Structures are given as C-alpha cells and as structure tokens.
A protein has these predicted regions:
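Short, low-complexity, Pro/Ser/Thr/Gly-rich segments in the mature regions of secreted, periplasmic
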Residues: 222-232
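Glycine-rich catalytic cores of cysteine/serine-nucleophile enzymes that process amide/ester linkages
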Residues: 24-37, 44-46, 94-107, 133-134, ...
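Short alpha-helical segments used as structural interaction elements across diverse proteins
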Residues: 27, 49-50, 160
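Cytosolic-side transmembrane helix boundary signature
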Residues: 32-62
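...with weaker cross-activation on analogous glycine-rich loops/strands in unrelated enzymes
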Residues: 74-78, 127-207
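N-terminal capping segments
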Residues: 56-155
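Generic structural signal for short, solvent-exposed loop/turn connectors between secondary structure elements
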Residues: 3, 43-52, 74-81, 91-94, ...
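Membrane-embedded alpha-helical segments of integral membrane proteins
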Residues: 2-43
C-alpha cells in the first residue's frame, strides 16, 4: 500500500509541472492538473495522520480555505482590475503563437485575452482578499472560449458595444482599455491597450505583438467591439 501511495505521489509530482508548463490546454489537461494538485495535497495529510493535533489543524486549514471561497464577493474595483489586466496582457508581448496555448510558453489569440484576465483576476483576488474574484478567476481558467465565442457573449462574460467595417472606422469615444475586437468571421480577437494601440497573438508572424492601428492586416477586417463585464 505504501509503495502504491508513493508511486501515486510521484506521478502527481511529475504530472503537475508538465501540465502547467505545456502551452496547449484542454478540459482533460485541466482536470489532470486539478487531480495532480489534490493528490499532492494528500502528502501533508499522510504525514500528519499519526499526530492528531497536527492532523486537526491541517484539516481545519483546508476547511477554512473552502469556506472562504464560498463567502460573498466584495464590491468590484473595475479600474484596478482593468489596470491589472493591461499589465498582464503586456507581459505576453513577443510570446510565441501556439494554437490552443494559454501561457507564456505559447498562446493563441483567444488564450491571450482570456489568460490575461485570469491572471489579473487571480492577482486582484489575493490582493483584495476577495473570494468572488477568486471564483471568477477559476471560472475563466476552466472554461475555454474561442474568439467566436467571446464575440457571442459566451457565459455572459462579454457584451457587444458596436460594430465597424474596420478598425479605422471605430468611434474612439466608444473605446475603453481592455475592450476586445472580434473579427466578424470569428477567427481572431485583439485587445485594446489604449492610445490606438492593440495587442494580439497573431498566427501570421506566429507571435504576440503590439501595434498601432494601420490600414493593413487584421486592422482591415470587419469587427465587433466587445467589452468584459468584469471591467465595467
């Protein structure tokens, strides 16, 4: 029994970093990540088992974390979250484009705009000790969403602001930092950084880059301007 338990822990220890570092993610890989993480959490439980007081404190700590995550959300600070989102998006500049990727080792267009918000929301949840934001970060991480899905308001995360025949036709008065521009064919999405500047994980040069609006490339495509409800 001890040998099987040790092998299980070893498997979890190998699986967790591999699943985290792998650029591409699927529902199966995310489930595997959670299983490996929970498996590693059983190590301190096993070590504390012979000591009742230590075991009680450990179980109480786990219970406290679970209870805390169920507490009501605090009033959101959309400005702080938007600033954090823009900061996270910029950390991906020059990252390699990988279809289905969701981290700095490789990322695609929808992965970029979603993962930036996952990271920003998780960081703000810890900074503000907000269980509501923690739950939202987990939701954003768990449920994948393509560019097309984001343009259709998937799970109520986004809503439409306006439509335009291309980026140059967008009314600047309608733009807010953090807004998303989804091409109307649903193939691509970019995020607005401000000052006529957008960030995108571009499948053409196969990298993430920041550009000002020009009359070429994706900037000539018909678009739907979407806004994250979290940032309002």
């Amino acid at each position: 029994m001890r040998r099987l338990l040790f092998l299980f822990w070893l498997l979890c220890g190998v699986t967790l970093p591999l699943s985290v570092l792998r650029p591409e993610t699927t529902s199966a890989s995310k489930l595997l990540t959670l299983v490996a993480l929970l498996g590693l959490c059983t190590i301190p439980l096993k070590l504390a088992a012979p000591h009742r007081r230590a075991l009680f404190l450990l179980l109480a700590s786990f219970a406290l974390v679970l209870i805390t995550l169920q507490l009501p959300a605090r009033a959101p600070d959309a400005t702080a979250l938007r600033d954090a989102y823009l900061t996270e998006l910029r950390t991906y500049d020059t990252a390699t484009y990988v279809w289905g990727g969701e981290n700095h080792r490789g990322i695609d267009c929808s992965g970029l705009v979603r993962r930036g918000l996952v990271d920003a929301t998780a960081n703000e949840a810890m900074r503000r000790r907000d269980p509501g934001l923690a739950r939202r970060a987990l939701e954003l991480w768990w449920f994948d969403a393509s560019a097309q899905a984001l343009g259709e308001g998937y799970r109520g995360w986004t809503h439409e602001v306006t439509r335009a025949k291309d980026f140059l036709s967008l009314d600047p008065a309608l733009l807010r930092q953090g807004d998303l521009a989804v091409t109307q064919d649903g193939l691509h999405v970019l995020a607005y950084l401000g000052d006529s500047t957008w960030i995108q994980a571009d499948p053409v040069p196969m990298r993430v880059h920041v550009d000002r609006v020009t009359a070429k490339g994706w900037f000539t495509a018909p678009i739907t301007l979407m806004r994250w409800r979290l940032l309002e």
